[in-house]
Amino acid sequence: MRLHHKSLCHILCGGAVVIATHPASAAFVEDSKASIDLRNFYMNRDFRSGTGQSKAEEWAQGFMLKMESGYTEGPIGFGVDAIGLLGVKLDSSPDRVGTGILQSDREAPNRAQDDYGSAGVTAKAKLSATTLHVGTLQPILPVVMRNDSRLLPQTYRGAWLQSKEIDGLTLDLGKLDRVNQRNSSDNEEMTAFNGGRRNIQFGSQTSSDEFLFAGARYAWSPELSTSYFYGGLDGIYKEHNFGLVHVLPLGDKQSFKTDLRYVHQTDDGGSNVDADAFGAMFTYKLGGHAFGAGYQQLNGDTGFAYIAGSDNSLVNLVQINDFGNEDERSWHVRYDYDFAAMGIPGLSLMTRYLSGDNVDRGPGASEGKTWERNTDLAYVFQSGPLKNLGLRLRNATTRSNFGSDLDENRFIVSYSLPLW
């Protein structure tokens, strides 16, 4: 659905009318909240190799209006949430399109639309510690993770049941039938990403209107948690996803975190998906410092499959790559610093380096190799008239003997304004 500038006001006013006229409890109104998030996004991607377009460079302003009601009284409480998304082009041209922050013009695909957006409503119900959401969803689960790395977030349409009746145990069950990509106004069927050297092939079915998921997460203690999830894109692929996270307190502002992940994927009748992914990330924290090291390995006849446009659960998913190609092995070193330790709360730095090899490039070809370097510098104002204003600079460089060589910069200014 195309969302024009006035639609944000219509959504907010409509939501306010629903709350104000609902005959139910005070909690429905008193527990409601609304906010508008502003995101100004500049992105420059320099294509260092190949012919054709030399770079992608665009600038845009995003508006995200969110409204959440409380629940009505009674054994089963009911409520409604709403979201309105609008992206406005500030700068683009036909020779610089393709950053992913703007939607392509429907009549001229080599141009970006002046604006784009969508609106969504979610009905919800709550019984004890169990909730059901039906409508627009933004899941962040091991088998399906909405992507929010550009101007506007990716959203899904479906139903999601979550239960926390047992202390420490979270159960999830759901079905998705449509996805609205981060630079789109349309709810569409889902497909699996098959770029890079994943060597994923489809039969006659290339998309699906059914993604089923179910899983459990259990916190055995404040230090240890485990998870299992099943996810399946009907007719294309299915996966079993296992995770373990342990944090060992070492005293004196020190800790050691272990993050282990294993995913087994197979086809579901309409593809050749066959992959096993193992990942491990270890992080030592000392005061404001964090030192991380990780390893990831892919085995099987294909690379890692996931819903196109989304994020995934690979430990080496970073700014540009996820190192999930067929047979790829990759390692990862990372350093973070929280400047609150120096008396500058809100300022943070992250830098990391990843290297991958052993990628299957086909019969007779040498192994594929790639590396990527990321640096993030971010600051959020903690007080004063600019409180909650965030500034973030993201830089990435990647080189490969089977893909594109890229240099990338993103500058993001964000601000969240509570409305009530």
Predicted regions and their residues:
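Residue-level signature of outer-membrane beta-barrel architecture
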Residues: 27, 69-71, 124-127, 163-165, ...
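Residues that define the transmembrane beta-barrel architecture of outer-membrane proteins
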Residues: 30, 55-63, 115-119, 153-157, ...
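Transmembrane beta-strand segments that form the barrel wall of outer-membrane beta-barrel proteins
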Residues: 38-42, 132-146, 171-173, 214, ...
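Outer membrane beta-barrel
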Residues: 67-100, 109-189, 216-224, 293-301
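Outer-membrane beta-barrel translocator/channel fold
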Residues: 88-90, 172-207, 253-330, 395-411
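Outer-membrane beta-barrel "beta-signal"
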Residues: 196, 214, 333, 375-381, ...
